[in-house]
Amino acid sequence: MGKYNLILSEYLSFIYNSQSAVQIPIYYSSNSELENRCIEFHSKCLENSKNGLSLRKLFVEYNDVIENATLLSILSYSYDKYNAVERKLVKYAKGKPLEADLTVNELDYENNKITSELFPTAEEYTDSLMDPAILTSLSSNLNAVMFWLEKHENDVAEKLKVYKRRLDLFTIVASTINKYGVPRHNAKYRYEYDVMKDKPYYLVTWANSSIEMLMSVFSHDDYLIAKELIVLSYSNRSTLAKLVSSPMSILVALVDINGTFITNEELELEFSNKYLRAIVPDQTFDELNQMLDNMRKAGLVDIPKMIQDWLVDRSIEKFPLMAKIYSWSFHVGFRKQKMLDACAGTLKTEYTENVDDEMYREYTMLIRDEVVKMLEEPVKHDDHLLRDSELAGLLSMSSASNGESRQLKFGRKTIFSTKKNMHVMDDMANERYTPGIIPPVNVDKPIPLGRRDVPGRRTRIIFILPYEYFIAQHAVVEKMLIYAKHTREYAEFYSQSNQLLSYGDVTRFLSNNTMVLYTDVSQWDSSQHNTQPFRKGIIMGLDILANMTNDAKVLQTLNLYKQTQINLMDSYVQIPDGNVIKKIQYGAVASGEKQTKAANSIANLALIKTVLSRISNKHSFATKIIRVDGDDNYAVLQFNTEVTKQMIQDVSNDVRETYARMNAKVKALVSTVGIEIAKRYIAGGKIFFRAGINLLNNEKRGQSTQWDQAAILYSNYIVNRLRGFETDREFILTKIMQMTSVAITGSLRLFPSERVLTTNSTFKVFDSEDFIIEYGTTDDEVYIQRAFMSLSSQKSGIADEIAASSTFKNYVTRLSEQLLFSKNNIVSRGIALTEKAKLNSYAPISLEKRRAQISALLTMLQKPVTFKSSKITINDILRDIKPFFTVSDAHLPIQYQKFMPTLPDNVQYIIQCIGSRTYQIEDDGSKSAISRLISKYSVYKPSIEELYKVISLHENEIQLYLISLGIPKIDADTYVGSKIYSQDKYRILESYVYNLLSINYGCYQLFDFNSPDLEKLIRIPFKGKIPAVTFILHLYAKLEVINYAIKNGSWISLFCNYPKSEMIKLWKKMWNITSLRSPYTNANFFQD
């Protein structure tokens, strides 16, 4: 503890360095005598500062508080006006400002011109192309960097080099910004026309990216990469990231494999010492040299040289530098184009009649057959999900935009909103709700568009379709996904697997007579050719399925689904262009349908099968695996003879020629040793992930608060760090300080302490130790957690008013009545709460809640409420367990090879000692018998929290719960009377605890918790038969051991002597654990 608080104190003296500035620390304690001293100390501090007296004497007088109590927050006063950043910046602005080359980008507005040249008037101006979309400002970012630099100017040795590298890069940034002045943001952290008009348009987003990069510089290589990207991204806002990351798709094919991990029959990773040579035809090197040439043409010097130097040996040892370049390229920021250009890219696809009809037919048939295969069983058995598809759709209706703003009446309140869920309610109330009619999206009612921005790729468009499309597709798509879940070809959906499993799949079949074909089909998805054959394949499949059933409701579901496909074959989109709204015919597939992911995978599989069936006419091979994963597909082909350069050359050219015959603009490559797809790449038999999450620029604005964004920032930093891109932790902590501080008045600000931000309460933002989730068990920690729980849920007047209106009530009642066969308060209340929670995406409500949250927080941070909550948290459970464990030193040898080279050393060490896991631990209760029983008869999906509540009820209440959801009485009776029920109790508790302990997030998801090597460090004598207690004791012990190893790089063993008398008490407590949602858990979830 304490590192954060120390930096916080230094940061405050750095920011408020004038005479008038005062810092008042606020302490608290769970000990009532000490707590009184804390209160006295605080009031005397306020008294003294009001009278302009020094606080130094008080610090001595109240030494007991400072020594023994816990810091709660720091209150800072400053009467200084705000030109502080500019003043400090001058000191660093000693270099030559960058001059943007205004001819680099094809589109005029992507050149970094002075804003008033791009937008002559305030009316024309938009910040949408450069909006950092994050609730922190450029001035804060500059402050954070300057704070770090000032703090480290006296570093020595290796640290001094880091300081000098960063100082040098910051000089470039500071000089450029200083030339134009620091742009001031408004209250919403946006940059308005008056501020920007005389400055380069992309100044802010470029500076944010540059700061993010320079604060991630450690080595000399980092420095060279960063410098080049910082300088060039000032001018090149369009293609830089793409140019720098392109070579990777070829580099992965150049590294020999000397030992790798493969997936065995039990789906575990197993080391295999196979040696495989990378066989590379000359043509591949020509293509690579072409890419390096393009990089040099764009002004890159050092990066292409690094790649060139690596090519001499092509060793896996030096490959992490290539991985680093690949990751860094994304940190130049998002490419944000105008919607018109985003559409143009996909619409200008060259259309030709000169295509191979035979292949198209095959492609369409494969899609048709796959759709039939996926849905055959549920349709034949008149599955209840397909019968009640409308209700299922309503229950999972999102609160995203429905494409247009409407005036809605809720009781006496009239509001304007675009949200789907509100539109459904309003339509029902006004008898406009007609899910049986799918509105057309033709020239009369074109589709409004959303956008998706990614670094290094062009902006993609998203359809915002009317909610009827969602309702029509939901149930059918769910059934498709269930099929995909147990079909290994669908890497993305395959049951509880993670990326490591897919990695072992690829390496498993590689040998000297195989090659792997990998294709990026993202262009194919949006090419006009994909519309007719694709939609027709789905329609033909649905027609076949319609003949397999006589159930009117199932037929209706299939029919509505078919209608969505027919409508979308004739689709138009609307694009605002200035004041006019352009309508453009749009043939292709865009995301925004419920089926996007599933249908894309189906089409993708059909595509690669079509291509393989063609080239099998020329070459003789066996297909060992085919996988599709999002926009990518790959296949391992096995030949009768050893693979030669010539063979690769031939296969490669044939594959490309085959794709060309379908007029598919795809990037197809063939290699013997590695692949590169969007999500991961395999080189030299090792797996790599791109560490490309931007920290100081966001893709879009949502309704998350500053606290949420601080937690997301931290979470992004952790993911990047696990993937090999490390940003200075002190800088991240400084950002968290800035983003979690609360302004009381203009000159008064409150900064929460580490304890507040790291205790798992509803306010948790980060972990005091990276990769280790701590559950505080000391008196002070539990005390503050309880205090925060007292003000967890915030009310919103608007939300209450809407929820009280008949429109809302009738909607909830309607859902309950359609779903339930008899009264069931748990479910009815659950639905009402879910619907009310969906209202949070309506801005006025989230604002209102945020205000309430902040005022409660302000009170709390100045003096914790003495509140004895009776709720039990996971902390209480662990606190009960802790005293019964004794620790001793232990030793575990390193026994596994590295396969993820980018991991931080301390995490790598643990995997090398205890092994990794290739599966997700089930933490949602879906595998339990009760969950399966419910889904067999009902479309309702209870959450893990609800299952946990239900399974601990009396048996007859469980029966009633089941019967009300339409489970036949005989099944409900059988369930409660069987052994399965008691197994379920244990199983659901297990899932619930795993869920609370975030076992599938952060670096915990990489460790094998069932490793025998880990088990042997834990000794717990078996007493009595309470499996749940044994489980929690073991899990606690494993986490303790692993956390200790992450922190210290050595192992301990734990012995637990848990008294039998305590076991039953603990067991009872375990059925009353409250789950805590915080910005931190949301950020974890957000990563998914």
Curated annotation (Swiss-Prot):
Q: What superkingdom does the record give?
A: Viruses
Q: Which UniProt keywords apply?
A: Magnesium, Nucleotide-binding, Nucleotidyltransferase, RNA-binding, RNA-directed RNA polymerase, Transferase, Viral RNA replication, Virion
For whether the record's keyword set contains Plastid, the answer is no
Enzyme Commission no: 2.7.7.48
One family from Pfam that matches here is RdRP_4
Per its UniProt record, the required cofactor names are: Mg(2+)
Query: Single Gene Ontology BP term?
Result: DNA-templated transcription
Is-annotated flag, keyword Nucleus?
no
SUPFAM superfamilies in UniProt: DNA/RNA polymerases
Q: From the Swiss-Prot or TrEMBL record, what is one GO molecular function term?
A: nucleotide binding
Q: Which residues form the RdRp catalytic domain?
A: 501-687
Provide one Gene Ontology cellular component: virion component
Catalysed conversion reaction: RNA(n) + a ribonucleoside 5'-triphosphate = RNA(n+1) + diphosphate
- Family per similarity comment: Belongs to the reoviridae RNA-directed RNA polymerase family.
What is its biological role? Answer: RNA-directed RNA polymerase that is involved in both transcription and genome replication. Together with VP3 capping enzyme, forms an enzyme complex positioned near the channels situated at each of the five-fold vertices of the core. Following infection, the outermost layer of the virus is lost, leaving a double-layered particle (DLP) made up of the core and VP6 shell. VP1 then catalyzes the transcription of fully conservative plus-strand genomic RNAs that are extruded through the DLP's channels into the cytoplasm where they function as mRNAs for translation of viral proteins.
Assembly behavior: Interacts with VP3 (Potential). Interacts with VP2; this interaction activates VP1. Interacts with NSP5; this interaction is probably necessary for the formation of functional virus factories. Interacts with NSP2; this interaction is weak.
**The protein's name:** RNA-directed RNA polymerase
Task: Please give the organism.
Answer: Rotavirus A (strain RVA/SA11-Both/G3P5B[2]) (RV-A)
Task: Give the organism's phylogenetic lineage.
Answer: Viruses, Riboviria, Orthornavirae, Duplornaviricota, Resentoviricetes
